[in-house]
Amino acid sequence: MSKTIKRIGSRRNEHRVLKGVIYVQASFNNTIVTATDVRGQVISWSSAGACGFKGTRRGTPFAAQTAAENVIRTLMDRGIGRVEVMISGPGRGRDTALRTIRRSGILLSFVRDVTPMPHNGCRPPKKRRV
């Protein structure tokens, strides 16, 4: 007789999450959107590159919007209704990603800009000559 083997990674005992944190990391070349629970466990992530955008199109606002929509879709499926948003970086997709999260219907607890600012740290790269 064969014994039944307990499945590893069974989704039956998955804990219910009601509140999450969305991190938007917007660089000049790409936008990465990560959704975690309040403990920091990653629920879902997406980036402009993972959505199929290549090269310079990854830094566009539309690519950031697509990445944010993918993460929000996963959060809605999990039943998460309230999120905190942490935005980091100087990229063009940061405002578009925030606008997409606002329009989605998920309640925002707060929005925080966590872009690291140097207190006159490293020397910046030289000016670009085109």
Swiss-Prot record:
Gene3D superfamilies linked: Ribosomal protein S11
- Give the InterPro entries listed for this entry: Ribosomal_uS11, Ribosomal_uS11_bac-type, Ribosomal_uS11_CS, Ribosomal_uS11_sf
Name a Pfam family for this protein.
Ribosomal_S11
Task: Tell me the subunit arrangement.
Answer: Part of the 30S ribosomal subunit.
Source organism: Pinus koraiensis (Korean pine)
This protein's record includes keyword Phosphoprotein: no
Task: Indicate the family of this protein.
Answer: Belongs to the universal ribosomal protein uS11 family.
Task: List the molecular function annotations (GO) for this entry.
Answer: rRNA binding; structural constituent of ribosome
Q: What is this protein called?
A: Small ribosomal subunit protein uS11c
Extract one GO cellular component term from the record.
ribosome
Q: Which UniProt keywords apply?
A: Chloroplast, Plastid, Ribonucleoprotein, Ribosomal protein, RNA-binding, rRNA-binding
Q: What is its main location?
A: plastid
Instruction: Output one GO BP term.
Output: translation
Cell compartment(s), UniProt: Plastid, Chloroplast
Cross-referenced NCBIfam families, in alphabetical order?
Answer: PRK05309.1 (NF003698), uS11_bact (TIGR03632)
